[in-house]
Amino acid sequence: MANHSSLPSQKYAASERQEYQKPQQNEEEIFYSVSRAAYLTVFKSSLDNITTKDQLQLVLQQTGRNPSNRVLNKYWTPRTKELNFDDFCAILKKEKPATKNELLKAFRKIDTNNKGYILHNDLYEILTTKGEKMSQEEVNSVFRLAEVNSNGKLDYNKFCSTFFKTCEQCAKVASERMDSNSKAKRQQFGSYIEKSPERSSSPKSSHGNLKLFDSETSTRKENKSSRPSSARSYKATMSTVINMGIPGTRTAKLIEPNNLKDWHTTSTKGCFFLEDNGDIISHHYKLQVSEKSTVYLTIKPLNLSKVEGKPSPWMSVDTSLFILKENNGRADLVSFTELRNQETSGWKGELGVGVYWLIPFTTGCRLRKKKKQTIKEARLVYRDGNEDLVLTPEFKSALSDMFDIIDLDGNGLLSLAEYNFFEMRTSGEKCDLDAWEVCKENFETKKNELTRQGFMELNLMEANDREGDPSDLWVTLQTMGYNKALEMTEACPFVIEVHAEKCSPRLKAVSLESSNKQLQGAVCKSVKLKGDAKPMDRYEDVIVYTYKNDTHVTSVMENKSDEKLILQVNNEQCKNCISSRGLQVFAVELLPKSVMVCQHVMPLNEKQEWMYNCVQNILS
């Protein structure tokens, strides 16, 4: 960001995020279902791998994409041996298909007189000599389409309509082919399963080795016993049943030290953000302890509601902290916040001199993609009697809350470091020192930091730069977790407090990123340390670790064998539960000599009893 005019406007494109109604498939489930249908037009199973660049091109084309050689080379390098279905889905999320408007815009650059058609001779010369050149036969195949060509001219409006209609028909045929066997549809692991009201989201690629299992496996008849699919033959099986009771009746609660007011204290804010692919990113922190001391630290959601008795909707999101110690370039698990008191999760223990990582964590059971519903778009700006642009009260309220979230130290001002976390989230770029000086010259500041009013002025300038077009403002809002009704549905702000008895702790936010690999490793270690271990019947090389506290159950699987295994996980007998996987039945691929998080499970209704009843079966 080199100048103030670009300060608020460098926002990356983000698809509209909206809430959902319960009976509908959610956005992520639809994405995986469509992706899988396209994959199965080329491969027999979604467990088959892409082994050549030509296969990658073909399967991408089945999704309506037409990847250039540059795009193909980005994902299929000289070192690439194969890509799996998860890799394929990741590519689809990065390489969006062209829209009809984009294609029409490209044609209109050629049709400078806006006639609605292009002469074959002109189009032939462009397509065979410019960019990635098409062959003569490829161009002629377009010209042979009778419904869009006449008298040596291509009607590009008709061509675009035909092209996208054909893409839709191909996707529909692929989906119908995948679902043609109604019995197999009941067994689709990793896709939407009907009649399961306790599920509200789809699987996330962030869970390590998750594979979407195919309906080509043998079918399962509906069975309400504690061991479903008893007619099926498994290599091994086991079940875990835990009656959890009512969450509010916990036996061990988080208790503050009596003399906490005499301890040294520091605090900071942060936020979980839900990505389009279901991943969750958050601020990461470094904690410096200068003297061996007893430390008490907590994390809880940040309530921004101004209405007494009506807390912010994200207050039900579970939050925890994992404490890691820097050790010769590694980060070793120290502990995590295990005890709770209402929304607050905390830990008390002794920390030695050194630098520690504090990594916020949420299970993903409650912060998750929502299903779509039609909602009225809020108005962001309007023109007053003098025709000047003005921010609406609703938008100003949302911006004020946003300011409170990114004001990490809570001093009512935004430092350059705090503002840059906001910029990295919304535009992917940082504000350099020169641009920050320009910012301070144009917007209200105090002590070299941006005030709340200055933040409002900055967003108003963005609206003026676009002559009232709110598109860029919506990108900012959506990347910060807001929907079109100005409700924050895909983010959860939180506050962290650190108290040390003998020294002044130093706490600093150092990054805003996904922590899948580091955090998944810490979760696995914590569950292995504190959970119950149980080997699978008839296959003791697979151990299932189950950890429970008052708020959730976490399951971790370890494969000690030298072979890759496919496991079915069945939650159909759970009561009042919601899984981080978003499904009642799914399959996972467990690599040789590996440990992975299977799932997190929480109560759907915290005021009622809940029961964790999970059956795991080795399929192969």
From Swiss-Prot:
Ca(2+) binds at residues 407, 409, 411, 418. The keyword Calcium applies. Keywords: Calcium, Cell membrane, Cell projection, Membrane, Metal-binding, Repeat. SMART domains: EFh. InterPro entries: EF-hand-dom_pair, EF_Hand_1_Ca_BS, EF_hand_dom, Miro-EF-hand_domain. It comes from the Eukaryota. Residues 213-225 have a biased composition (Basic and acidic residues). It is a peripheral membrane protein. GO terms for molecular function: calcium ion binding. Its main location: membrane. Residues 1-24, 176-234 are annotated as: Disordered. GO terms for biological process: positive regulation of protein localization to ciliary membrane. One of its GO terms (cellular component) is ciliary membrane. PANTHER family: EF-HAND CALCIUM-BINDING DOMAIN-CONTAINING PROTEIN 7. This is EF-hand calcium-binding domain-containing protein 7. It comes from Xenopus laevis.
